[in-house]
Amino acid sequence: MHALFVTATIPDYEKARKELHEEVIPMVSQAPGFVTGYWLAPVGTRGNSVVVFESEEAAQRGREGLEQNPPSQVTVESIEVREVAGHA
């Protein structure tokens, strides 16, 4: 498994949270190879998410999708594709 580790700036958490639940989560959960996702509440304006995919290829496709169609309520600062070393 591979994951996207995303860092974003979130200037308005309430607006971003609404977009997350109404648009982002429904779209991401339909992505090929999607396993699970976690979007963490920001500290200040800095937020992170971890979205897990079945393969590196699926994660790369997820990265490309995010780069091409980022959420409107956040500024994506970085997207890293990382191997999942373990889970419980």
Model segments located where?
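Short S/T/G/P-rich N-terminal loop/turn motif that feeds into the first structured element of a domain
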Residues: M1-G47, E54-G65, T75-A88
